[in-house]
Amino acid sequence: MKSMKIAVIPGDGIGVEVMEAALHILNTLDLDLEFIHADAGDACLKRTGTALPEETLEAVGEARATLFGAAGESAADVIVRLRREFDLFANLRPVKSLPGVPCLYPDLDFVIVRENTEDLYVGDEEYTPEGAVAKRIITRTASRRISQFAFQYAQKEGMQKVTAVHKANVLKKTDGIFRDEFYKVASEYPQMEATDYYVDATAMYLITQPQEFQTIVTTNLFGDILSDEAAGLIGGLGLAPSANIGEKNALFEPVHGSAPQIAGKNIANPTAMILTTTLMLKHLNKKQEAQKIEKALQKTLAEGLVTPDLGGKLGTMEMAAEIARHLED
């Protein structure tokens, strides 16, 4: 059986360190994966004159999936371009409490599905004599596609409810289209509960009653904001994985940035990167291996064998070694 090619882009700052930790754990398992290393980010820009070389784009295009560490100031030129270049339309942000990690809600388990290609993030802005104007683009095609993805994901994961988040009471045309397409898709899944909330109410409910949610689907800007808010419920961005999924390609990245202030000190928490690898494995139909890593990570966290940000004394690679040890349990 031919190995699946995985493009590996460590990027900048702690991205390099957490990627090393994740690869150490992946290499402990017999996964039939071939890792193709590629370059991108601030250091790449300084060295080559471009933050995202053509050879990196080629590597991503040829790979079954891409693991990405972190990008610094060049993040928009790297990750945003990769999302657009490969039409990675669905951003998946699981929100799940972890054992041994202090958090606001110890039993959370839901997901935010964010449309990744439209909204204000198309970057169509211009100055006017009085200020500036930005164009918000919401299409029926993209709204239907992301709603379809959300229902399919919820069904696959055994969830019973999908909630659309919008502001159609004010943004009547753009969010009106998003809400309309959501309910058209919902009609194809009569066995599932479909609800919708305004984004401001959702921001409150995430704090007061987050257990009510199972799958949230929303537009680009709202999803960006709400998913970071949700990460705060489970301990912060250092514990949050994400996936960017398209029809043909998929890219997996931790939510945290390059954190240059702690880069090179061997204290970066690898949890988000390791959970990101489990999302990749599930996408590649290696669910058993993903669950094995998740259980090993949970044991390590429960034992307090963690990095300083979680109250422990281990370095990045030391924590990775403990997780790898638990893979053998």
Curated annotation (Swiss-Prot):
Gene Ontology molecular function: any one: NAD binding
EC nos: 1.1.1.85
List of residues binding substrate: 83, 93, 114, 200
Subunit structure, interactors included: Homotetramer.
Entry keyword annotation includes Isomerase: no
Co-factor: note: Binds 1 Mg(2+) or Mn(2+) ion per subunit.
Known role: Catalyzes the oxidation of 3-carboxy-2-hydroxy-4-methylpentanoate (3-isopropylmalate) to 3-carboxy-4-methyl-2-oxopentanoate. The product decarboxylates to 4-methyl-2 oxopentanoate.
Binding site for Mg(2+): 200, 224, 228
Cellular component annotations (GO), alphabetically ordered: cytoplasm
Record protein name field: 3-isopropylmalate dehydrogenase
Keywords of the record: Amino-acid biosynthesis, Branched-chain amino acid biosynthesis, Cytoplasm, Leucine biosynthesis, Magnesium, Manganese, Metal-binding, NAD, Oxidoreductase
Annotated NAD(+) binding sites: 257-269
Taxonomic lineage of the native organism: Archaea, Methanobacteriati, Methanobacteriota, Methanomada group, Methanobacteria
Species name: Methanothermobacter thermautotrophicus (strain ATCC 29096 / DSM 1053 / JCM 10044 / NBRC 100330 / Delta H)
